[in-house]
């Protein structure tokens, strides 16, 4: 996309928080040029939390943001949709501490964006382009990013049977995201449920908003939406965490059994070293691609 965007009209949704189990309502509203994505806690006098890597607070089982002690949790699905569908500037009014899980995927949010419509501003979009490779590793897990003229993902996952090893590669565009990733739901294992509930997690989880596996397969009556739904959902999560860069990304991200903590570490590594990236406009990118084709 050449220009910055927002939504044309407000839209709203309601549900429960996956981990808190609390009822929550969100409204997505247009925001001015260069606002970015800003969460607005309507239950706390409109307190604002920008969706930025600077405000990452928790990265265990979900990504949470915090500013001055005020929390917004499980942000990754909604941010994934904004980032992939090309939504740069919105206010997200929310009346509790956790984004609603809805059906566990990004698809309901994609439908909300379609309902809202997209408005282009005249301000040129500025992209974050990776200039050199970097990686983060920990205990056999790894996430890397390489220079690329598109936003490209390679995602490798490995889980207990019956899921096993899965892999996925795609160029992230609104069209590819809507058809290849948005439908993939969050997931877990039946034998982990008691432990997670004892940790204060998944209080809002059900078969209506998550895939639950046993050693024999999913408990969900309708089964899986794709054989590799788990890998697709991890790619969806990854995009949501990369959205905290604050600008559309040009680079090839390779995630090998990575999770929220490693995603956050990569983002912090990028933003902590300006030599890793440059900020360019769509026109500058197009000019470079044209020159490369001619030369």
Curated annotation (Swiss-Prot):
Residue positions of the active site: 260
Keywords of this entry: Hydrolase, Lipid A biosynthesis, Lipid biosynthesis, Lipid metabolism, Metal-binding, Zinc
Gene3D superfamilies referenced in this protein's UniProt entry, alphabetically: lpxc deacetylase, domain 1, lpxc deacetylase, domain 2
A Pfam family hit: LpxC
Any GO MF annotation of the entry: UDP-3-O-acyl-N-acetylglucosamine deacetylase activity
Cellular component terms per the entry's GO annotation: membrane
Residues the entry annotates as binding Zn(2+): 77, 233, 237
Pathway this chain belongs to: Glycolipid biosynthesis; lipid IV(A) biosynthesis; lipid IV(A) from (3R)-3-hydroxytetradecanoyl-[acyl-carrier-protein] and UDP-N-acetyl-alpha-D-glucosamine: step 2/6
Catalytic activity: a UDP-3-O-[(3R)-3-hydroxyacyl]-N-acetyl-alpha-D-glucosamine + H2O = a UDP-3-O-[(3R)-3-hydroxyacyl]-alpha-D-glucosamine + acetate
Top-level taxon in the UniProt lineage: Bacteria
EC number: 3.5.1.108
Cofactor(s) needed: Zn(2+)
General function of this protein: Catalyzes the hydrolysis of UDP-3-O-myristoyl-N-acetylglucosamine to form UDP-3-O-myristoylglucosamine and acetate, the committed step in lipid A biosynthesis.
Protein name: UDP-3-O-acyl-N-acetylglucosamine deacetylase
Native organism: Solibacter usitatus (strain Ellin6076)
Originating gene: lpxC
């Amino acid at each position: 996309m050449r220009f910055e965007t927002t939504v044309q009209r407000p839209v709203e949704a309601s549900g429960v928080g996956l981990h808190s189990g609390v009822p929550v309502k969100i409204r997505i509203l247009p925001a001015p040029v260069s606002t970015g994505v800003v969460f607005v806690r309507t239950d706390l006098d409109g307190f604002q939390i920008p969706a930025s890597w600077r405000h990452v607070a928790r990265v265990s089982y979900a990504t949470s943001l915090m500013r001055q002690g005020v929390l917004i949790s499980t942000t990754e699905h909604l941010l994934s949709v904004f980032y992939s569908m090309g939504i740069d500037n919105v206010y997200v009014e929310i009346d509790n501490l956790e984004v609603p899980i809805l059906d566990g995927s990004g698809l309901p949010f994609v439908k909300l964006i379609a309902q809202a419509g997209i408005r282009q501003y005249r301000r040129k979009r500025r992209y974050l382009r990776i200039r050199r490779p970097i990686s983060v590793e920990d205990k056999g897990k790894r996430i890397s990013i390489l220079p690329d003229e598109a936003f490209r993902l390679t995602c490798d996952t490995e889980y207990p049977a019956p899921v096993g090893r899965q892999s996925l590669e795609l160029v992230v565009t609104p069209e590819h995201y809507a058809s290849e990733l948005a439908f993939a739901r969050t997931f877990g294992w039946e034998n982990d449920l008691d432990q997670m509930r004892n940790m204060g997690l998944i209080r809002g989880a059900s078969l209506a908003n998550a895939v639950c596996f046993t050693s024999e397969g999913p408990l969900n009556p309708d089964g899986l939406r794709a054989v590799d739904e788990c890998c697709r959902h991890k790619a969806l999560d990854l995009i949501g965490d990369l959205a905290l860069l604050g600008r559309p990304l040009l680079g090839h991200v390779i995630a090998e059994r990575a999770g929220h903590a490693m995603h956050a570490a990569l983002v912090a590594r990028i933003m902590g070293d300006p030599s890793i990236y440059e900020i360019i406009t769509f026109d500058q990118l197009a000019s470079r691609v044209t020159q490369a084709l001619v030369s």
